[in-house]
């Protein structure tokens, strides 16, 4: 249930997503969480005063999953954006992907920021100062335009510079609220921006979305081997978790001069880059997106780079990635972006 108009957001965020067991002592540092399947059974549970309480807590299927499935039934495609390493431009790419899909006025797009401790999507989308609105239907996304909506923990913080210092169970609880209580309405694409790595948030999103039918994941890398090393682990995670990999995108593949559009290689692909990795791992290569300093400027100002600089090599590359993703989720690429070159 969404917070009431009289209840402060900070109070609501401090509350768990559902009533936990009545613990008799604080949770230890490596506690798996009272709601975890390993509650009372993990190595960290040995000697904990709460062990018997957690072990006897109700287990079984999450009763909220049918509610999430019903809530997202009107969302046609759900796409995860993953990266094995921080700093590869995953959130920037997520915002570009959302703007790319939304450049078709016939498509309605949402972007959900599940990077709870480092939410940057609102800034990139130009809605950082907005707050969540509540109706009888649930939480309303913050709309960037008529066909592009955003949901992020950033909208719920009293101050924009406040740190979110939460352990896994509380972060997972908020992700569940985003999926269960946000009224996305009729939507063509929901893009889920995740934190780097393979953390609780990834497991939570995957388990909660499994019944509602997640289309798959787009994995983002940069050309260097230090990034590819972590991407291999991310691909392994997807396969073990049963997440379909829609394809790999190589971000920052070169530098585009904004004056002459000449492309120079800044980060050298010492081991073949994303394209070679995709071939070796047996996954589609969706494309290479070059660096353009105007991308950072557009994100700082919360504007659409794709719309403002449509002829940039980076914009053209993003459009091709959008068409490729559309094709892999079962759409006609020509209907996804009719005017893409």
From Swiss-Prot:
Keyword match Iron: yes
A Pfam cross-reference name: ParA
Cofactor note: Binds 4 [4Fe-4S] clusters per heterotetramer. Contains two stable clusters in the N-termini of nbp35 and two labile, bridging clusters between subunits of the nbp35-cfd1 heterotetramer.
Binding residues annotated for ATP, in chain numbering: 84-91
Location within or outside the cell: Cytoplasm
Segment forming the signal sequence: none
Cross-referenced Gene3D superfamilies: P-loop containing nucleotide triphosphate hydrolases (3.40.50.300)
Cofactor: [4Fe-4S] cluster
Transmembrane segments: none
Amino-acid positions noted as binding [4Fe-4S] cluster 2 in the UniProt annotation, renumbered to this chain: 257, 260
Chain positions recorded as [4Fe-4S] cluster 1 binding sites: 31, 45, 48, 54
Listed GO biological process terms: iron-sulfur cluster assembly
PROSITE patterns per UniProt: MRP
Molecular-function annotations in GO: 4 iron, 4 sulfur cluster binding; ATP binding; ATP-dependent FeS chaperone activity; iron-sulfur cluster binding; metal ion binding
Keywords, ordered alphabetically: 4Fe-4S, ATP-binding, Cytoplasm, Iron, Iron-sulfur, Metal-binding, Nucleotide-binding
Region called Disordered, residue ranges: 1-44
Biological role stated in the UniProt entry: Component of the cytosolic iron-sulfur (Fe/S) protein assembly (CIA) machinery. Required for maturation of extramitochondrial Fe-S proteins. The nbp35-cfd1 heterotetramer forms a Fe-S scaffold complex, mediating the de novo assembly of an Fe-S cluster and its transfer to target apoproteins.
Subunit note: Heterotetramer of 2 nbp35 and 2 cfd1 chains.
Record family assignment: Belongs to the Mrp/NBP35 ATP-binding proteins family. NUBP1/NBP35 subfamily.
PANTHER family assigned to the protein according to its UniProt record, in alphabetical order: CYTOSOLIC FE-S CLUSTER ASSEMBLY FACTOR NUBP1, NUCLEOTIDE-BINDING PROTEIN NBP35 YEAST -RELATED
Protein name: Cytosolic Fe-S cluster assembly factor nbp35
Protein source organism: Emericella nidulans (strain FGSC A4 / ATCC 38163 / CBS 112.46 / NRRL 194 / M139)
């Amino acid at each position: 249930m969404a917070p009431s108009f009289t209840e402060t957001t900070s109070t609501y965020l401090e509350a768990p997503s559902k009533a936990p067991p009545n613990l008799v002592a604080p949770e230890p540092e490596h506690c798996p969480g009272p709601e975890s399947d390993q509650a009372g059974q993990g190595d960290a549970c040995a000697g904990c005063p709460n062990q018997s309480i957690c072990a006897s807590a109700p287990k079984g299927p999450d009763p909220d999953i049918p509610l999430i499935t019903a809530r997202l039934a009107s969302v046609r495609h759900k796409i995860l954006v993953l990266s094995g390493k921080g700093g590869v431009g995953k959130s920037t790419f997520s915002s570009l992907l959302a703007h790319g899909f939304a450049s078709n006025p016939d498509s309605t797009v949402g972007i959900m920021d599940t990077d709870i401790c480092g939410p940057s999507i609102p800034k990139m989308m130009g809605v950082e100062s907005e707050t969540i609105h509540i109706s009888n239907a649930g939480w309303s996304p913050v709309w960037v335009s008529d066909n592009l909506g955003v949901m992020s923990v950033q909208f719920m913080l009293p101050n924009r510079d406040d740190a979110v210092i939460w352990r896994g169970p509380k972060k997972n609880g908020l992700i569940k609220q985003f999926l269960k209580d946000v009224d996305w309405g009729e939507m063509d694409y929901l893009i889920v921006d995740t934190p780097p790595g393979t953390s609780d948030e990834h497991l939570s999103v995957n388990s909660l979305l499994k019944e509602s039918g997640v289309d798959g994941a787009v994995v983002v890398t940069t050309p260097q081997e230090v990034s590819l090393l972590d991407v291999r682990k991310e691909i392994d995670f997807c396969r073990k978790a049963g997440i379909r990999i829609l394809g790999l995108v190589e971000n920052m593949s070169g530098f585009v001069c904004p004056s002459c559009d000449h492309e120079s290689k800044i980060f050298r692909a010492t081991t073949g880059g994303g394209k070679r990795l995709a071939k070796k791992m047996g996954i589609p290569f969706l494309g290479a997106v070059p660096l353009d300093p105007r991308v950072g400027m557009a994100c700082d100002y919360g504007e659409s780079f794709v719309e403002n600089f449509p002829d940039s090599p980076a914009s053209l590359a993003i459009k091709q990635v959008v068409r490729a993703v559309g094709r892999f989720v079962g759409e006609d690429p020509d209907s996804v972006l009719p005017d893409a070159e």
